[in-house]
Amino acid sequence: MSLLQIAEPNQSAQPHKHRFGLGIDLGTTRSLVAVVRSGKAQVLPAKDSTDTLLPSVVYYPATGMPLVGHKALAHLPNDPQNTIISAKRFMGRSQTDIKFSHPYELSGRREDMPTFVTAQGEVSPVAVSACIL
């Protein structure tokens, strides 16, 4: 990652004192967000947590909003069909390409990227990733 310094004409070319950059790592199993302020990197804690690593997991209950991270992971043992983990492994692949074991019911044409069938309906791997972000 690099930072680009932009200055108005006739202003100092010196870098400003308070530069800011943001980075997001959407990992297969864990995700994180970090900021760079004045040249120092800091990993931010997940919402409602002191942990900086957020499990890349989304739980889709029959009613209500999807749960993300540790709250979603707690539902994995009892409801694996509606608890989506490692959604990135399904991105950019057709159902024909998916050779690994998983607990999900998949929908869609065999030659297209699948969608997960959940209690809240069909959800694409891209939509699961968007919930994590």
Regions found by a protein language model. Give the residues of each.
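N-terminal phosphate-binding loop and flanking beta/alpha elements of the actin-like ATPase fold
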Residues: 1-55, 60-133
